[in-house]
């Protein structure tokens, strides 16, 4: 058979598949009244994957105009039902464990990165216990102790990094924030011993491990692709580093080399069934902590600095807020930051809050349907063949809740503070917290999988931003306005390159 016949048959088969797909969609809309509307698509299996992947929010808003808040689209062959709005967030993120499951969706992606038997590679009840174990580093006392550590990391970085040589220059702010936040996460959530190991080798390992969070790994986490081979090698090496620390401490009587730290805490933890936390799981939890503590802070920190560079007047407002609201030393200068200072810096926190509203790093939260789910107030029943998708960022970007929603305006929060009903407070087993789903603003998720590091994230970012603003001014480079677009090619969205901004030292200008 000639190549022309092969091509002809292939084209014929492709055309037939499209025709059958169109017939299926017609029949689906005509007879499946108990299912949400299906987003129109030409190519089977691919479905709406490309439109969704290129710009998820554009996809969500355009589909909402056509189909309403509830619709289904095909994501690489998988029927994915989206339910937008606060009711959708409640339905999906507060779904019962017997009805919706996060582990089945995320485990193939996260387990090769974090390791086995932690996070999504274990029953939810075990994850709840693991969250309780790490609250050691998120307690009030711990947060208070974190402030000087974070400030020192930023000051040392400004003094030692070639990015900030001299009195003025330019910097790739996304790269700089990635470095700063891995150092602050290391100092605070990991401890002195691990922080001392955050050298070039560790940075390379972290980078290779991070590449495991690529969208293709939702489907092919086992594929022998170059980035997966590097991911697996990096995980093995990073785990070995933690195991080595643990072994040395056990021989020395379980003592940290400096102040008590997370590893020492985890070495003393025991599950409810009486089983001590295995060393392997300690190592995997430490890897998870490092990546969780750095990922969102790095992305949001980059967006904050890009926004500030685009509006230098806000940079000066932040600096003046510190001068006006914080105590001074005898010579009139600002003293080192303390935990008590944070509450006296409302504009700093509003800058973070507003940036989280516009630039959340996770646009989609997924759950596998385990039992047929009737949607209250609708004729729809979601079958077990579907995955549910919640997009809390949609309400955060809606004029309905935030007038002129696409504008970055930290001052909007002076009259629009986020509220959480006391009736929404629930304890999933690791401390009382808000379910949060009734709010249109959910930058840290909601329900039992809500991020427990919210207070740390605000603290970390507030201290980083306050310290940078004390020492530097920022501005866009000549000819540039606004901020870059969003890169959705990674699982954790961030700013598109280039992300270079200008800076100058305050002391240099005042001199």
UniProtKB/Swiss-Prot annotation:
Name of encoding gene: resB
Listed cofactors: heme
Bilayer disposition of the protein: Single-pass membrane protein
Domain of life the protein comes from: Eukaryota
Species of origin: Aspergillus sclerotiorum
Single biological process term from Gene Ontology: sterol biosynthetic process
A single Gene Ontology CC term: membrane
Full protein name: Sterol 14-alpha demethylase resB
Catalytic activity, EC: 1.14.14.154
Transmembrane segments: 3-23
Primary role: Sterol 14-alpha demethylase; part of the gene cluster that mediates the biosynthesis of the tetrahydropyranyl antifungal agent restricticin that acts as an inhibitor of CYP51 and blocks the ergosterol biosynthesis. Sterol 14-alpha-demethylase plays a critical role in the biosynthesis of ergosterol, the major sterol component in fungal membranes that participates in a variety of functions. ResB acts as a self-resistant CYP51 that contains mutations found in CYP51s isolated from azole resistance strains and that is not inhibited by the final product of the cluster, restricticin.
């Amino acid at each position: 058979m000639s190549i022309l016949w092969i091509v002809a048959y292939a084209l014929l088969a492709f055309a037939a598949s499209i025709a059958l797909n169109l017939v299926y969609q017609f029949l689906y809309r005509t007879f499946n009244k108990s299912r949400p509307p299906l987003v129109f698509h030409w190519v089977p299996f691919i479905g709406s994957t490309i439109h969704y992947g290129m710009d998820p929010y554009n996809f969500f808003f355009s589909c909402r105009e056509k189909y309403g808040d509830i619709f289904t689209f095909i994501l690489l062959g998988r029927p994915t039902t989206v339910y937008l709005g606060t009711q959708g967030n409640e339905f999906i993120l507060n779904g019962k464990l017997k009805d919706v499951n996060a582990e089945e969706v995320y485990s193939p992606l996260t387990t090769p990165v974090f390791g086995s038997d932690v996070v999504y590679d274990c029953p939810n009840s075990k994850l709840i216990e693991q969250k309780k174990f790490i609250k050691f580093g998120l307690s009030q006392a711990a947060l208070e102790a974190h402030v000087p550590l974070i400030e020192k990391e930023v000051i040392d970085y400004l003094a030692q990094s070639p990015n900030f040589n001299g009195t003025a220059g330019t910097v790739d702010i996304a790269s700089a924030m990635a470095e700063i936040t891995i150092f602050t996460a290391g100092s605070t959530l990991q401890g002195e011993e691990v922080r001392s190991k955050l050298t070039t080798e560790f940075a390379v390992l972290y980078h290779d491990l991070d590449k495991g969070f690529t969208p293709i790994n939702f489907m092919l986490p086992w594929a022998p692709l170059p980035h997966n081979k590097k991911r697996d090698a990096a995980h093995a090496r990073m785990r070995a580093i933690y195991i080595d620390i643990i072994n040395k401490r056990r021989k020395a009587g379980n003592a940290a080399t400096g102040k008590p730290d997370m590893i020492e805490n985890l070495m003393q933890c025991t599950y409810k069934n009486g089983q001590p936390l295995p060393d392997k799981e300690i190592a995997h939890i430490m890897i998870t902590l490092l990546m969780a503590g750095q990922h969102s802070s790095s992305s949001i920190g980059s967006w904050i600095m890009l926004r500030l560079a685009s509006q230098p007047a806000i940079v000066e407002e932040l600096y003046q807020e510190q001068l006006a609201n914080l105590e001074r030393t005898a010579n009139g200068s600002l003293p080192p930051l303390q935990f008590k200072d944070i509450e006296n810096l409302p504009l700093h926190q509003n800058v973070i809050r507003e940036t989280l509203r516009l630039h959340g790093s996770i646009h989609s939260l997924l759950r596998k349907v385990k039992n047929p789910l009737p949607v209250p107030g609708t004729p729809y029943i979601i079958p077990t063949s579907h995955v549910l998708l919640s997009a809390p960022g949609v309400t955060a970007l809606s004029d309905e809740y935030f007038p002129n929603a696409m504008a970055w305006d930290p001052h909007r929060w002076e009259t629009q503070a986020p509220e959480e009903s006391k009736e929404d407070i629930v304890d999933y087993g690791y401390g009382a917290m808000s379910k949060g789903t009734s709010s249109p603003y959910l930058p840290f998720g909601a329900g039992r999988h809500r991020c427990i590091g919210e207070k740390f994230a605000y603290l970390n970012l507030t201290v980083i931003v306050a310290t940078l603003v004390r020492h530097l001014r920022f501005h866009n480079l000549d000819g540039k306005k606004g901020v870059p677009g969003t890169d959705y090619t990674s699982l954790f969205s961030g700013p598109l390159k280039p992300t270079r901004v200008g800076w100058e030292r305050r002391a240099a200008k005042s001199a």
